[in-house]
């Protein structure tokens, strides 16, 4: 039981270890962050139009797992919030499942998740709902009833219509119109502010008409909705009651006041109209307007009509929001200042996206920029001759745009790539090699500026034209790596051999090519430096029999020293300018019947067929005795002539000597020939006798017998050679032993044949001569026929090898031996030393050398 528990515990620890290791090695998946402009990634900062239909695939979640495991995607929302999206867990495709309304919710927070088998990563991202023109202007104070005193002056504002469009941009701007001028001939409305006033020259008459009904139309600026341009409007009815005037402080009509300055406005434009009336409806007083504070000189107001006018250009305004205090003062008919009232008019400076990006040069707007520069500038260098500025006069996001350069290849790059309002444009070199004068002498690029976040996507283009100047960046190049030429021998000096051509794509002086030749075979040739024509030296004499092959190098070089090489092979073609010449030694021949004789002629021409010779017999008497081999020159008897008897039967000549006229003719064109007289003495072979002769004659019929005999002789010679070599080797080994001291015993000379001597001193009895028997190459022993032969000397051991083994130094000859050698050399022909003494000296020298050898080993 205890062992079972221990086994279970060990298994548990092992499983825990594997889980721990597996957990350590498993990494969590992650999303790709491709930025807000991408359609795949983690949905961060995704912009989605509110008019996107349900069921649209709006995005693709995209991520990966470091271990390569499959991942699943998910989308969740805050508890209780509406779920707008659904995601496919495997593909990551996100689908819109609910309608969007930016006015209700302009930002949706989403929890996107990515998970593998063990880990899950959740990220909170925001999806921004972009506006579409789907909202109508909504009146804030309509329909309404307005009381207007009948003594209200013409041009006075009587009401401010307010309508709000919850859309943004141009779709959220509101302009006002009266539906029909016939229904309200006495009134006019400001299109931007919505202020309704009495038309100039018109007045109200309480007695004639106490009520006026006006239909006001509010229209937005239009925008994109479901892919189409759409303008939306609303209408409402304003009822104007004309009342009699009464005595009361002024009352501003239509407060609060909001006015807008658009960038298209100019000085003098009416920005807003304030309107105040006297509270005394039955007997109202005159009201005058003034600006109390907050205008900063940028605005002015008409004191009677209340019209606020712009004094500056919108670009010169220092602020985006102005809060202006307007004062309305009652003036009595006598001109006395009475009661007054103040109100605040808020004026905002509104930017419209009505300016596309514009490129500027040094002298103003410009859409073509030209530059002249050398080819192959350094990579990373900016084009200094281009002074380009780009500007968008709009504000905020309306002035944000991208820069892009379009042209051949990726030679240039523009910096910066994203601009807000204004930037200096810099163009950098990215691919210097592509900017090649030889490929194109000018380059044209399009510089594009395209707005990013605006519906209009205004853009601008400018042409950049670069004129390239040539540099010496190319070496001359031959049309071929080698040239093969043939020229006949005996061509006169100055003859053209071959023309070489090298091209340098550079222009002007850089494209000028000069030619030269060099090399061991160029001695007899010249080249025209400008044309590349190779010709022979004026003194050159070409002879194919002397030299038929030449090769050398030709060099093409531009003015800066850039060059290339080509090899020229010149073959001197042979002309048939030598006739055949007979060998004088072959003109007298003795012919044995059955064996041919050969004559030979030599043609000194260098090439075939000029040096190929054909032999023929031109004349022979009689002409039916000889045949000649046309190729080899072998002359032989006719096959039927097999004995001297047949020869003598053919001719009356008893001396058997013929003179044959033979012609040697070459095969050149034109052909040369030479004739000569060949004297042929015909004889018959002497028959051989004996068994050996009989054997050889029989072997002619059976050559294998002859080959067997030759093989046997060779084997016997090899065997004898091995035996002799073995005997010599054994004798040398015995002679190399150290022998005891010897005494020379003088003996009387005995008559003995010279061949019985067993030492190297030999004496020829027929011819007196001296033999060099000094095995150490230092002592010469001379012997003559007179005086008489010396007695037998002791047998000398064989000499030491004349060369030491590899790696051993030679032993020097002892002094005694050297002294004897010196003396003996001086008397090479007169030797007075006794042969016995000479033998003793040689033995002494040998012992000394053997002793030295023993000491060394």
From Swiss-Prot:
One of its GO terms (molecular function) is calcium ion binding. This is Cadherin-related family member 1a. It comes from the Eukaryota. Keywords: Calcium, Cell adhesion, Membrane, Receptor, Repeat, Signal, Transmembrane, Transmembrane helix. The gene is cdhr1a. Residues 1-25 form the signal peptide. Its main location: membrane. One of its GO terms (cellular component) is plasma membrane. Residues 731-857 are cytoplasmic. GO terms for biological process: cell adhesion; homophilic cell adhesion via plasma membrane adhesion molecules; retina layer formation. SUPFAM superfamilies: Cadherin-like. Residues 40-139, 140-252, 253-359, 365-478, 479-582, 574-693 form the Cadherin domain. The keyword NADP does not apply. Residues 752-765 have a biased composition (Basic and acidic residues).
């Amino acid at each position: 039981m205890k062992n079972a528990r221990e086994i279970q515990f060990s298994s548990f620890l092992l499983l825990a270890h594997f889980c721990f290791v597996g957990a350590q090695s498993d990494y969590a998946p992650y999303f790709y962050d491709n930025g807000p402009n991408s359609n795949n990634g983690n949905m961060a900062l995704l912009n989605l139009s509110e008019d996107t239909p349900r069921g649209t695939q709006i995005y693709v979640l995209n991520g990966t797992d470091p271990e390569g495991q499959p991942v699943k995607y998910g989308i969740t929302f805050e508890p209780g919030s509406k779920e707008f999206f659904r995601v496919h867990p495997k593909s990551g495709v996100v689908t819109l499942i609910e309608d969007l309304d930016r006015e209700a919710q302009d930002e949706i927070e989403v929890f996107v998740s990515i998970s593998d088998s063990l880990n899950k990563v959740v990220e909170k991202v925001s999806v921004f709902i972009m506006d579409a023109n789907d909202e109508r202007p909504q009146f804030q104070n309509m329909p309404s009833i307005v009381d207007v005193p009948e003594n209200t002056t013409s041009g006075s504002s009587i009401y401010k219509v307010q309508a709000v469009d919850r859309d943004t941009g141009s779709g959220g701007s509101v302009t006002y119109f009266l539906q029909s001028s016939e229904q309200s001939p006495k009134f006019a409305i400001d299109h931007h502010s919505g202020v309704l006033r009495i038309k100039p020259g018109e007045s109200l008459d309480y007695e004639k008409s106490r009520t006026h009904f006006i239909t006001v139309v509010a229209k937005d600026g239009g925008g994109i909705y479901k892919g189409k341009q759409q303008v939306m409007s609303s209408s409402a009815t304003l009822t104007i009651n004309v009342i009699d005037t009464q005595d009361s402080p002024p009352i501003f009509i239509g407060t609060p006041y909001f006015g807008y300055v658009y960038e298209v406005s100019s000085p003098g434009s009416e920005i807003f109209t304030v309107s105040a009336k006297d509270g005394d409806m039955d007997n109202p007083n005159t009201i005058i307007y003034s600006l109390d504070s907050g205008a900063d000189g940028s605005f002015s107001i008409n004191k009677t009509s209340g019209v606020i006018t712009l004094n500056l250009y919108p670009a010169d305004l220092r602020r985006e929001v102005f809060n202006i205090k307007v004062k309305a003062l009652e003036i009595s008919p006598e001109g006395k200042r009475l009661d007054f009232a103040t109100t605040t008019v808020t004026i905002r400076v509104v930017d419209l996206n009505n300016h596309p990006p514009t490129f500027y040069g040094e002298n103003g707007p410009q859409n073509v920029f030209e530059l002249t520069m050398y080819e192959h500038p350094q990579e990373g260098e900016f084009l200094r001759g281009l002074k380009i500025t780009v500007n968008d006069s709009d504000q905020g996001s309306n002035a944000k745009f991208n820069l892009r350069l379009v042209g051949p290849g990726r030679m240039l790059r523009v910096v910066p790539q994203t601009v807000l309002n204004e930037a200096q444009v810099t163009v950098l070199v990215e691919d210097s090699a592509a900017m090649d004068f030889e490929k194109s002498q000018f380059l044209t690029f399009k510089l594009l500026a395209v707005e990013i976040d605006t519906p209009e996507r205004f853009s601008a283009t400018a042409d950049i034209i670069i004129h390239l100047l040539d540099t010496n960046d190319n070496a001359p190049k031959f049309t071929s790596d080698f040239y093969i030429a043939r020229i006949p021998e005996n061509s006169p000096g100055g003859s053209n051999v071959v023309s070489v051509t090298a091209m340098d794509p550079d222009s002007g002086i850089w494209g000028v090519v000069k030619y030269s030749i060099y090399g061991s075979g160029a001695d007899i040739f010249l080249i025209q430096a400008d044309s590349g024509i190779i010709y022979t030296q004026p003194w050159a004499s070409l002879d194919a029999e002397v030299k038929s092959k030449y090769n050398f190098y030709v060099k093409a070089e531009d003015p800066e020293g850039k060059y290339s090489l080509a090899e020229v092979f010149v073959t001197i073609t042979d002309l048939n300018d030598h006739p055949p010449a007979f060998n004088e030694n072959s003109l007298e021949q003795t012919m044995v019947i059955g064996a041919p004789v050969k004559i030979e002629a030599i043609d000194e021409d260098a090439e075939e067929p000029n040096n190929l010779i054909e032999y023929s017999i031109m004349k022979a008497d009689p002409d039916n005795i000889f045949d000649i081999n046309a190729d080899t020159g072998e002359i032989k008897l006719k096959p039927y002539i097999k004995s001297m008897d047949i020869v003598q039967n053919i001719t009356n000549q008893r001396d058997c000597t013929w003179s044959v006229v033979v012609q040697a003719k070459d095969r050149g064109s034109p052909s040369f020939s030479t004739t000569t007289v060949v004297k042929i003495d015909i004889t018959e072979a002497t028959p051989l006798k004996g068994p050996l002769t009989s054997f050889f004659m029989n072997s002619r019929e059976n050559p294998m017998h002859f080959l067997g005999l030759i093989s046997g002789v060779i084997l016997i010679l090899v065997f004898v050679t091995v035996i002799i070599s073995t005997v010599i080797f054994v004798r040398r080994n015995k002679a190399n032993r150290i022998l005891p001291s010897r005494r020379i015993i003088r003996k009387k000379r005995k008559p003995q044949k010279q061949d019985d001597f067993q030492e190297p001193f030999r004496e020829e009895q027929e011819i007196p001569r001296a033999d060099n028997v000094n095995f150490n190459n230092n002592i010469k022993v001379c012997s003559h026929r007179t005086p008489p032969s010396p007695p037998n000397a002791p047998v000398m051991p064989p000499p030491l090898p004349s060369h030491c083994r590899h790696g051993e130094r030679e032993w020097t000859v002892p002094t005694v031996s050297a002294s004897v050698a010196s003396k003996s050399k001086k008397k090479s022909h007169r030797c007075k030393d006794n042969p016995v003494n000479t033998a003793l000296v040689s033995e002494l020298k040998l012992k000394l050398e053997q002793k030295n050898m023993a000491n060394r080993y």
